[in-house]
Amino acid sequence: MLYLYLGLSILSALLLSPRPVLIPLVFLGALLALALLHVLVLAVASLFVDRQQPDPKGFPFYRKLIAASVGPFLQLGRVRIDLVGAEKLPEGGFLLVGNHRSDFDPVTAMYALRGRGLTFVTKKENTTIPVAGRIILGSGCLSLDRSDDRQGLMVIRQVVRRIRNGEAIGIYPEGTRSKTGQLLPFRMGCFKAAQWAKCPLAVLKTEDSELVGRNFLRRPTTVRLTVKAVLPYEQIADMDTAEIGEMVRRILTT
């Protein structure tokens, strides 16, 4: 409602402006006002998320907030998302894994697959970012302390429970973004989540997301997200995690 009111006010100001030369200034001021209003909405919404004990399932409201933030950000930066193969994704819960090339990867995938309510396991450091960290937790993303194996096991168990309840959860097996574009060694334990949840394993390949920051505002960028394969549970049920990891690696590099 606030956005609608401000939008109508801006439209009125543009239409009634006695000096056409002022219209660009009014427009730029309007964009700034909308941006500040959106930041205020995010800041207020973040206050309702307990960083120490967030709701393990998250809330659709916060996922919509992320989508409402990422969409304009991509448009402003002249970034286009090319999603290929989404029709392969199964109904119900599944584990999504893929390569990790940029800090933008999780939110880009969440935005592209926003109709599926996708959330991610994210490193603990991301959840300590002012305002954004609480929004991330509020959306249902799970905080992982990479230095604590016991906490990591607890997170995997949470992933399993949520997938069994029909959710789509994403994990980057590399554990961190690759600065060279080449796949890093996998942390094989994450594949256990698909075996324990008895769910399909979807493989998502991300291309050119590392160019977003480099090209932002300067030139158009197309980020390609390709669902390369969906491995049914029956195919991975009796494999060890190293075998699953090698299969995923082959899929991502072909």
State what each model feature region is.
Residues 1-10, 18-93:
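Membrane-anchoring hydrophobic helices of lipid-metabolizing enzymes
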Residues 83, 96, 120-121, 225-227:
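Generic preference for hydrophobic
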Residues 20, 153-254:
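Non-catalytic C-terminal accessory region of glycerolipid acyltransferases
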Residues 46-67, 75-76, 90-148:
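Catalytic core of membrane glycerolipid acyltransferases/transacylases, capturing the structured
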Residues 87, 149, 207:
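Residue-level "edge-of-site" marker
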Residues 83, 142-145, 233:
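Short acidic-hydrophobic, aromatic-tinged amphipathic segments that line or gate anion-handling sites
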Residues 83-86, 129, 153-156:
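Structural motif corresponding to alpha-helix initiation and N-cap regions
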